[in-house]
Amino acid sequence: MIPVFIVLYFLNINVIDETQHWTPFLLVRYMVLNLGVALLIGLVEESLFRGIVLVGLKRKFPVAIAILITSLYFAGLHFLSAKADPLIDDVTLSTGFSLLGEAFRNVVDPEHLSAVVALLMVGVFLGVLRTQVNVSLGLCIGCHTSWVWQIKMSKKLFNTDFNSPYQYLVSHYDGVVGPLVAVWLSATLIGYFIYQQTKKA
């Protein structure tokens, strides 16, 4: 994901947040804390999606279909949330269904489309890694952890300029995940499969 952040910086989409006043101690502390959070996220999500779900689906479907279904779950669940926060006195038997409906509407909201596609490609990339490389669950956890950590650090150190002429390369989801990430991971996968074909030739 480093090339993505380099492009975002040089296109002035990511602009250094000059209001932050860092000391070496604060920077290291923040880096370590976010690494711990990122590791936990990577461990849980990869164990679930590329571990339990993908392995289970591979028993019933071709590998490509299993990767696609897993990736759709992975991308969709990132948006399965509701903003409404009803008061205790307002909760009724239908409240849960209302919140669930709002959560599912977030998944199909056109505003989130570029981020959903990018996260779908993240899922496909990790699925290919899981199925093509031995002892790959650890690599998936490592990749996922490093990406989450980089995004968290980027959001702390930089501001996203949504007025940039290149703002279409990112989404409002987190200021990073968007078309640029989707294109980068797609190009990486295409390059990998071309390399695999040339090895067989």
Give residue ranges: language-model regions:
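Membrane-interface helix/loop boundary segments of multi-pass membrane proteins
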Residues: 44-76, 80-97, 128-136
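Hydrophobic/aromatic residues in alpha-helical transmembrane segments
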Residues: 3, 53, 122-126, 186-190
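Juxtamembrane helix-loop-helix connectors linking adjacent transmembrane helices
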Residues: 1-43, 54-60, 85-108, 166-169
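C-terminal TM-helix exit segments that contain a strictly Trp-centered aromatic cap at the helix terminus
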Residues: 3-11, 76-85, 150-155
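C-terminal membrane module of polytopic membrane proteins
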Residues: 143-201
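Functionally important transmembrane alpha-helices
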Residues: 68-71, 93-98, 102-169
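Hydrophobic alpha-helical transmembrane segments
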Residues: 31-44, 101-122, 175-187
